[in-house]
Amino acid sequence: MKKVVLASSSPRRIELLKQFGIKFDIVPSNVDEIIDPDLPPEKNAMNLAKKKAEEVFRRLGESAKDSLIISADTIVFIEGTILGKPSNEEEAFYMLKKISAKRHTVFTGVCIIDDSCRQILVDFEKSYVYIKQMSDEEILRYIKTGEPFDKAGAYAIQGFGSLIVEKVEGCFYNVVGLPLYKLNTMLQKLGYDLMKGEL
């Protein structure tokens, strides 16, 4: 059985991967999620995903031998601005106000390190999300749920956040944080397939 490592502590990514019956270790990366404003959002997402996977691979050392490390990084992009995770209520309010009644883009970079064949694959997925028009009162009420604080763009598409999302164009799971179709396409290039239970 292949040793699989998810380089993330995101409950959403963990749940998405668990549904395929894969046994995997959870080893969150210690990478600071620093955005390079000179790079396009998809490049930032891919760079951060790669840094996360590489950091975990290095830290595991000998125990990473022949393992498969999966990492991801999600970025929200609107009107030329990358929105990260809000660190307080003021930032969350600013972000939610900014995406209210508009379409924004969600990019998730995905990286897979397959030590058994010494390969690193990096790719990204893109989806468009339409948020309803929210009053200041609605924004504050949503912030009080506590959902915005560990999410890029200050919302979750599941939970209470589903009540502010009008529609999604593209991969839904990309918005959750792990684009499953893209992930499996990358795994197939390495000779694995989630549909066949090959991990």
UniProtKB/Swiss-Prot annotation:
One Pfam family, short name: Maf
Subcellular location as annotated: Cytoplasm
InterPro entries according to UniProt: ITPase-like_fam, Maf-like
Keyword Lipoprotein: no
Coiled coil ranges: none
Cytoplasm is among the record's keywords: yes
Annotated catalysed reactions: dTTP + H2O = dTMP + diphosphate + H(+); UTP + H2O = UMP + diphosphate + H(+)
CC per GO annotation: cytoplasm
Site keyed Important for substrate specificity: positions: R12, T74, Q158
Keywords carried by this UniProt record: Cytoplasm, Hydrolase, Nucleotide metabolism
Cofactor(s) essential for the protein: a divalent metal cation
GO biological process: nucleotide metabolic process
Active-site residues, as the UniProt record annotates them: D73
Signal peptide: none
The protein's Enzyme Commission number: 3.6.1.9
GO molecular function: dTTP diphosphatase activity; UTP diphosphatase activity
Purpose of the protein: Nucleoside triphosphate pyrophosphatase that hydrolyzes dTTP and UTP. May have a dual role in cell division arrest and in preventing the incorporation of modified nucleotides into cellular nucleic acids.
Protein family per UniProt: Belongs to the Maf family. YhdE subfamily.
Protein name: dTTP/UTP pyrophosphatase
